Amino acid sequence: MRAHGVAFCPASGRQLANLRAVLGPGIDDGPVIPENGLFSLVGGVELHSDPMTREQAVRVIDAVRQVHERGGDVGAVVATRHVAYVERTDEAFTSQVSTYYASREAVRDLTELALDDVLKIAVYDFGVAERDSGPQIRQVVPDLQTVASGLHWTDVMSTVGSKGRALSIIQEHLGVSPEQTAVFGDYLNDLELYDRARRSEEHTSELQS
């Protein structure tokens, strides 16, 4: 693709380290949108980031703890640019987190971290996220957006962040128009990408699930 002047840009809810592990280090040569669009890079150079505040991060962490105390089987992943932090270390939770976070660290108390570079907090629910933990967390943090990124995952993040916003920043940087952009998506967290492209392909069965 590159030889034909086409820039391939993976846009994912996964962390940058995980995308490198899955797609190879060659992704650093072009545009990349990790963490649901909370930051973007071209050629390994960061173009933008949309972190949450420390106060917001603490509220989300406390909300997840409260869901757990009420019987919800949930766990939080505090995602920064390069490392994801967790409190839960049981095998069941770790096996889910390791799929998407290649660079991670377990800590005793997430609120003891600096929390000055939190892009998002991903919440894994062993039940159905949108039915169980999602609505409870949404009530506690109305100033943040909660995005369903899978049957079991909810991403809590800045209200301005999205894959669509990240793509628009990359397009402006590269001088690429929506007419020159094709988008391929498979879940609800891909929807805003379609606003930035005139060519798109969606897997509707998955988008509606």
Regions found by a protein language model. Name each.
Residues E202-S209:
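Conserved small/polar residues in nucleotide/adenosyl-binding loops
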Residues P10, P34, V183-G185, E202:
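Short beta-strand scaffold positions
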Residues R2-F93:
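Active-site phosphate-binding/coordination module
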Residues V67, G71-F184, L188-R196:
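Conserved acidic, metal-coordinating active-site core of Asp-based
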Residues N36-L38, L151, S205:
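Short, acidic/turn-prone active-site loops that include or flank metal/cofactor-
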Residues H4-C9, D28-G30, K120, E179-T181, ...:
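Short active-site oxyanion
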Residues L23, V42, L193-R196, S205:
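Short loop/helix-cap segments at secondary-structure boundaries that form the rim of catalytic
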